[in-house]
């Protein structure tokens, strides 16, 4: 069975609630994302536990620091057995290269991707922090820098995926948050698409949180999304 393209964001405030969902899942059904809140509360032991159960883990901590510090943090993450981790492209070329080189010989070979422009930021928000151009302009510039650094891909909005796929080639991973099934409210992410739309535009993986984790029946929500994307 092909590994799932759905990454479930474990947006829970504690380990017990996260594990309550995980116990309903099979590693062949999905991948799991552990972010800042859950990692800070539950620690590396939870990541190790989930990885040991066979779940591909995306550790979403968005490292952004001087090159040496980020490189060491990436190695520490890889030692937890994660499938994927991320860093901030705004940390620059040297920082990204240091992270990539640190992981190059790690036995687990985790996927290293970069965050470009946060999906909560529209053009007005970018202007407020001094970045000229549209979100798409900034995403493309940072994506090219990420590829130059030798990373495996980026986190991006599905709306930018067609242009990125054309520019960066078919092997470059596009991991897309801001996914809401048809009819769901967009919440705090501005550049949103349905799962089907995002894959059709070139995304490789879909990060989906509240539409599954906050659903009355999370497994029913997951199955509905799987049905929606089954022929894309």
From Swiss-Prot:
UniProt GO MF annotations: orotidine-5'-phosphate decarboxylase activity
Record PROSITE patterns: OMPDECASE
Pfam families: OMPdecase
Chemical reaction(s) catalysed: orotidine 5'-phosphate + H(+) = UMP + CO2
Keyword vocabulary terms for this entry: Decarboxylase, Lyase, Pyrimidine biosynthesis
InterPro entries attached to this UniProt entry: Aldolase_TIM, OMPdecase, OMPdecase_AS, OMPdecase_bac, OMPdeCOase_dom, RibuloseP-bd_barrel
A GO biological process held by the record: 'de novo' UMP biosynthetic process
Protein residues bound to substrate: 11, 33, 60-69, 119, 180, 189, 209-210
Enzyme class: lyase
Pathway in which the depicted protein is active: Pyrimidine metabolism; UMP biosynthesis via de novo pathway; UMP from orotate: step 2/2
Residues annotated as catalytic: 62 (proton donor)
The protein's role, per its UniProt record: Catalyzes the decarboxylation of orotidine 5'-monophosphate (OMP) to uridine 5'-monophosphate (UMP).
Protein family according to the UniProt entry: Belongs to the OMP decarboxylase family. Type 1 subfamily.
HAMAP family registered for this protein in UniProt: OMPdecase_type1_B
Complex and partners: Homodimer.
Protein name: Orotidine 5'-phosphate decarboxylase
Protein source organism: Nitrosococcus oceani (strain ATCC 19707 / BCRC 17464 / JCM 30415 / NCIMB 11848 / C-107)
